[in-house]
Amino acid sequence: IHRKVIGVAHLMFHLPPNDKSLKVIHGDGIPFMKEHPESTDILMIDAFDPDGIPRNFRSLSFFDLCKSTLRTNGIFVMNIWASDPHYDLYIDRMRRVFEGLILVIPTGKPGNQIVLGFHDIPKELDVKTLRAKAKLLEKTYGLEFLSFFNQLMLHNHQASSMITFDQ
């Protein structure tokens, strides 16, 4: 667990400083999650060691713990590599724990993918609204949100059960 990762997130990914709506905690997240059920709106996991994602981040119990940490309407976000030998296992376990409510977004960097797991079916999901929000976020933060949205739509055929196309 390296504090430098938080600095990189501020520098490279525009992670804002802590304030009343964001609190970044440096430490072992597993004990924190066990002690704080239903306490998190967005849980982001980006855990790699020299051999890839550590073993304890692959278990069904880990993904169950992640979901139990989320509040109603919370979102789980995990960075994974499509080339990881355990890729199908991660996706299967996330799909089981989040009852099929997952979306995979290729990031444009070969092999790197972001997986979103939803505690509940998201409330506001129509294509027109989401595309407009992606454009606004892209303009505000200078990150490729519209590209991410387009990749999400392209690579998630099951998204049509969560996203409406009639507006």
Describe the role of every protein-language-model region:
Residues 113-167:
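SAM/dcSAM-binding transferase cores
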Residues 19-21, 73, 99-101, 142-146:
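A generic structural signal for alpha->beta connector loops
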Residues 34-42, 59-61, 108, 138-149:
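Short flexible/disordered coil segments
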Residues 1-72:
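The AdoMet/dcAdoMet-binding core of the Class I SAM-like
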Residues 60-124:
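C-terminal substrate-binding/active-site "lid" region of AdoMet-derived donor-dependent transferases
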Residues 7, 54, 87, 125-128:
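Generic domain-boundary/flexible-linker signal
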